[in-house]
């Protein structure tokens, strides 16, 4: 939703939530965080902040530890999920550091309280940070096991009244099949929430999609690896795949 300050008339969205996977921070590596990739993402975020758009982020932890994977190897699911949440805090702190190095004031709010490294998640405080032009990174998922960071992103987007949820991936939208494995796969330009659920398309998990559907929150799936794509989406360029109501799709 528009903030108290003057909004940028060029931007389609005035308040966004950008969802990054933990893997997005790895770059070409197989584990951990790539400083080069982190810097590139930080500059992408800064480009949008410079437009006057309010930016919140949620980051996964799969580059460090994935709770579901730990559970399949015999770990207790709740314990594994909490470990995954801690991984998201590490990623959030890394991105905060990268953003502040280029002059973007940033706050990390964690759903699991750890006062030495992050603020506790307080919805009203998060909104106030956004209104003051600060980037807010939501860490530790929802703070509960069995919920993905995609669901956390949907929840936080609703709580802060974001105009859109931007789902950053390594491909330029949603396809009928994995384009890396199937050259004949075709990209969807627009999808309804029901299409995503019925076709079991790998946009986000069903809980996250249902939450967005119930609250009319549009989702844009796009390629983060192309520098400048976040800005393009915010300015309304038709890239990636938009998920929303059928009426919006057919407009």
From Swiss-Prot:
Pathway in which this enzyme or protein is active: Pyrimidine metabolism; CTP biosynthesis via de novo pathway; UDP from UMP (UMPK route): step 1/1
Q: How is its activity regulated?
A: Inhibited by UTP.
Where would one find coiled-coil regions in this protein? none
Reactions accelerated catalytically = UMP + ATP = UDP + ADP
EC number of this enzyme? 2.7.4.22
Query: Does the record's keyword annotation contain Transmembrane?
Result: no
Q: What class of enzyme is it?
A: transferase
| Location of the protein in the cell | Cytoplasm
Function, please? Catalyzes the reversible phosphorylation of UMP to UDP.
Annotated Gene Ontology cellular components are: cytoplasm
Provide the family line. Answer: Belongs to the UMP kinase family.
What keywords appear on the UniProt entry?
ATP-binding, Cytoplasm, Kinase, Nucleotide-binding, Pyrimidine biosynthesis, Transferase
- What's any GO biological process attached to this entry? 'de novo' CTP biosynthetic process
Task: Name the Gene Ontology molecular function terms of this record.
Answer: ATP binding; UMP kinase activity
Subunit relationships: Homohexamer.
**Gene name linked to the record:** pyrH
Enumerate the InterPro entries for this protein: AceGlu_kinase-like_sf (IPR036393), Asp/Glu/Uridylate_kinase (IPR001048), Uridylate_kinase (IPR011817), Uridylate_kinase_bac (IPR015963)
What is the source species? Anaeromyxobacter dehalogenans (strain 2CP-C)
- Enumerate the SUPFAM superfamilies for this protein: Carbamate kinase-like
Residues reported to bind UMP: 61, 81, 142-149
Q: What is the protein's given name?
A: Uridylate kinase
Q: Which residues participate in ATP binding?
A: 19-22, 62, 66, 169, 175, 178
């Amino acid at each position: 939703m528009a903030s108290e300050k003057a909004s940028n008339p060029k931007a389609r969205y005035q308040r966004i939530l950008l969802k990054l996977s933990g893997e997005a921070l790895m770059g070409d590596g197989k584990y951990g965080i790539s400083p080069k990739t982190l810097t590139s993402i930080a500059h992408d975020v800064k480009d949008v902040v410079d437009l006057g758009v309010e930016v919140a982020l949620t980051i996964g932890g799969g580059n460090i530890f994935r709770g579901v994977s730990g559970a399949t190897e015999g770990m207790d699911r709740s314990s594994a999920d909490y470990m995954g949440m801690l991984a998201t805090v590490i990623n959030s702190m890394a991105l905060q550091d990268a953003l502040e190095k280029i002059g973007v004031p940033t706050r990390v709010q964690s759903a699991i309280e750890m006062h030495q490294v992050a603020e506790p998640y307080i919805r009203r405080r998060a909104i106030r940070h956004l209104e003051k032009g600060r980037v807010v990174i939501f860490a530790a998922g929802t703070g509960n096991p069995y919920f993905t960071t995609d669901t956390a992103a949907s929840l936080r987007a609703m709580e802060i009244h974001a105009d859109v949820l931007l789902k950053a991936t390594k491909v330029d939208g949603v396809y009928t099949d994995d384009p890396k494995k199937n050259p004949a796969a075709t990209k969807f330009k627009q999808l309804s929430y029901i299409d995503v659920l019925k076709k079991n398309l790998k946009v986000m998990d069903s809980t996250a999609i249902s939450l967005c559907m119930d609250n009319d929150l549009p989702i844009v799936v796009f390629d983060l690896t192309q520098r400048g794509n976040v800005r393009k989406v915010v300015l309304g360029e038709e890239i990636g795949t938009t998920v929303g109501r059928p009426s919006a799709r057919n407009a």
